[in-house]
Amino acid sequence: LNMLRDSFGRTFPYIRLSITDVCNFKCGYCLPNGYMPNKSDNRKFLHLDEIKRLAKGLSELGVCKIRLTGGEPTVRKDFFEIVKVLKNESGIKKVVITTNGYHLDQKANKIVESGLDGINISIDSLNREIFKSITSHDRLEEILNGIIKLQKLNFNNIKINAVLLKGINSSENDFKD
C-alpha cells in the first residue's frame, strides 16, 4: 500500500482540511476583526468535486480520517453535501469537524443525518459574559442546547476545545457547569 509519508517516514492516517477561512465569530486570538474579505483577492475555495477528488487521492495514500476545519466550516452552503460526499464517495472512513457551534441547536438533526462521525466544539468559557467577550457573540446557551440536542439524538462523539487566555478565561470556574 502506497502511504502518504513525510521526510521522517511518518505516515498520515488523518488530515485536517480547511474548507474555508470565513468565520462568523470574532475571537480575539484568531480573527479579532472578524473575516475581512479582500475584494481585490479573487481566490476561490475548493469546489465540491475538487474536495472529492482530493479525498479519493488521500484515501488511496492511506488517509482514513479527515477533520474539516476553517474558519468555520459550517458557513459553507454546501457543507452537508461535502460531508455526504466524503462519507459515501471518497473512501475516507471517518469525517469529523471542528466548529464554533453557531446554530448548533438548529443543525443537530442534519449533523446526525449527514453521517458525520464526530464534532469538536470550541467553547472558551461556560461563563456567558466571558464567552461573549471572547467571541463577540452571545451564543453560549444556543451552543450548549445544541450539544444537549445532539446527545438526545444519540450523537455522542462530541469534544470540547478551549483556548485558555491568561486573565480572561484561565480560571477553573470558567469551565464548571
PLM feature spans:
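Conserved G/P- and acidic residue-centered "switch" motifs that form tight phosphate/ATP-binding loops
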Residues: 72
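Canonical Radical SAM [4Fe-4S] cluster-binding loop centered on the CxxxCxxC motif
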Residues: 7-49, 61
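Radical SAM enzyme core and accessory elements
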Residues: 1-5
